C-alpha cells in the first residue's frame, strides 16, 4: 500500500483551474528520469479530478494501478494518489484530516489565493510519510488489526496447549467444570463424528 501524492487545492466554481495551495509527493519508487514527469502528471490529474469534484462531495477515480481520491469541502479540496490496495475509507479519513489541519493552520486565507503556491507545508509531507500505513489514518482499521492479531495469538495458545501431549479427551474427563451430562454429550458427539468420518 502506497501513497504517492497529497494535494490541497482551492476549487472555486468561477475559476477555470483549481489553485494548488500545497503539494507533497513521494516519487522515489519511480526511475530517476521519470520523476519530474510523474510530478507534473500528479499535478495535472490532481487539478483535473479536483475541478470535477462538486462541493461537499467525495469521489474516487481509477487511473491505471492508482486510485485518485478527492474530497471537496466547500471549495477547499484534498486529493490523494494511492495504489489500488489502499483502503478507500482510510483514504477519505486521511483527506479529511488533511483538510482539518489545513484550516487550523491557515484559516480562511486560502479563499484569496489566486495562483499556485510553491511554499512547502511540513504537515503534508509528514502526513504523506506517516499515513503510508492505512491503520494510522483510520482508527477503526487499526482496532480491527489489533483484534485480528489478538485472535491469532489466542489460536496459537490453544494449539500449543494441545500440542504438549495432552489430548482434549483427557482434559474433558479431568475437568470439574463439566457436568456428567456435558461429558457424555462430548463423548457421544465424538463417536458420531468418527462414525461419519469412516463412511
Swiss-Prot record:
Per the UniProt record, the source organism is Arabidopsis thaliana (Mouse-ear cress)
Could you tell me which residues are lipidated, with the kind given as S-palmitoyl cysteine? 195
Q: Which domain of life is it from?
A: Eukaryota
GO CC term, one of those recorded: plasma membrane
Q: Where is the lipid attached (S-geranylgeranyl cysteine)?
A: 196
Give residue ranges for domain v-SNARE coiled-coil homology: 139-199
Output the CDD domains linked to this UniProt entry. Answer: Longin (cd14824), R-SNARE_YKT6 (cd15867)
Q: PANTHER family in the record, alphabetically?
A: SYNAPTOBREVIN HOMOLOG YKT6
Please indicate if the UniProt record lists Cell membrane as a keyword: yes
Query: What is known about what this protein does?
Result: May be involved in the secretory pathway. Essential for membrane fusion mediated by either SYP41 or SYP61; triggers the fusion of phospholipid vesicles containing SYP41 or SYP61 and VTI12.
Q: Which GO terms describe its biological process?
A: protein transport; vesicle fusion
The alphabetical list of record keywords is: Cell membrane, Lipoprotein, Membrane, Methylation, Palmitate, Prenylation, Protein transport, Transport
UniProt subcellular location: Cell membrane
Q: What is this protein called?
A: VAMP-like protein YKT61
